[in-house]
Amino acid sequence: MKIGVSIPRLPDADGIREFCERAERLGFESVMAGDHIVLPVGGTNQYPYTPTGAFQRPSDEPFLETMTMLGFMAACTSEIRLGSTVLILPYRNPVVQAKMFASLDVLSGGRMICGVGVGWLEKEFDILGVPYADRGPMTDEFLAIFNALWTEEVPELQGKYYQIDGIYFEPKPIQQPRIPIWVGGHTRRALRRTAKYGDCWHTTRQTPDFVAENLPYLREQTELAGRDPADITISLKRSLHFTDMDGSEEGVGVRSGGALINTTQAVVDDVHYCNELGIDQLTFDFRVDGIGPCIQVMEHLAEHILPVAERLG
């Protein structure tokens, strides 16, 4: 069982460096960063991970751009894997995005994870001039573009949104045959996307039981796509808060679905349960405010949970 952590994307260079260096020293598999370009004043009712769709963040909360942050994180570390959880694929030109990931993979020594999703915040799409209704087909085509650019000597793809031919795309990623693609989402469409394009189903804000209930469909769709289900790993990302950790106050953020808010022993039991269900990787973000408190929770996680995960293999 592998465990990664999600970093707050706050404009605190020293804090980000300390978080990444500490995560690497503690033995976590990965540090991941989320993706938003803008957030709407007044919140939204579209958030897919709360019963009412409510998602309220401070309107002036600063979020660093994801690819820029991953480059900084790569320079702060030497071994830990780095990735997006998840990058909203329709927001950026796919050829440029593929180039950025390939460049970071080369510069980091082959440590990148390409976590992708379709997005959910319609206002953000409107501001960026991207058609919200097309986000699914765009994501599928962009993933096909990534695969062509990363694996073909002379990439070719004739799609609805982009036509690619007569070019070289260099350098290729260090990782072969390509940078691992972690497909986010919790719908049947996301599972079919994983089956066709992904190396990992990286669902978020769900329960372990939800994951287990959907694994038969994922395996079925993977076989229909002509691929071996054993080649696709399963990752679950959730918010984590230890209720018995001294000096750790739960933050003010939205309690999204699947949050793990419990004692240390209950978290240990949950890791065992996830392993029994066939989940290969867990990514946690922390329900505390600020990078300093996040580091404290991460250290508690490393002390009490990482050894359990390592014994599970």
Predicted regions mapped to residue ranges:
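Active-site-adjacent structural elements that line small-molecule/cofactor binding pockets in enzymes
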Residues: 1-313
